Amino acid sequence: MQTKRLFMQTVLALGACASATAAFAATPIKFQLDWRFEGPSALFLQPVAKGYFQAAGLNVVVDAGSGSGGAIQRVASGSYDMGFADMAALMEFHANNPEVKDKPVAVMMVYNSTPSSVLALKKSGIAKPADLTGKKMGAPVFDGGRRGFALFAKANKVGDV
């Protein structure tokens, strides 16, 4: 809740500055989500729907995404002004693109910890991370949790998956 409040205060403050300097013309902002419109997107969609951004002098357009990596690429290319993406994907972009001068940066954390998870049916017998050894897992290649799985596996002594 505090994160939401800080986000709104920041947006309203920026909006006040933008509207004062632009003679009350709405400042256009293209915002790229990491994924489709779903629960976590409400943080960005609700202020648009309620007119909060517009009241602050911001004309915000929020577009659905196709993964954190894509959101970061679009912000880095200048196609979007801002975006929402997984921190692991942002770190990966920085590591793989040292030549890019204006790399996207994280300005706010939404989650206290990654919302990634491994799900299995009870009948699978998987009850702890080590039980994943030798199993097959499925996740999209662009998924932030999948990209971070190697670190999780190493920290939890999980064998080949």
Where are the language model's segments positioned?
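N-terminal export leaders
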Residues: 3-8
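Short, glycine-/small- and polar/acidic-enriched structural segments
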Residues: 27-160
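Absolute protein N-terminus
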Residues: 1, 25-26
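Cleavable N-terminal signal peptides
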Residues: 13, 23-24
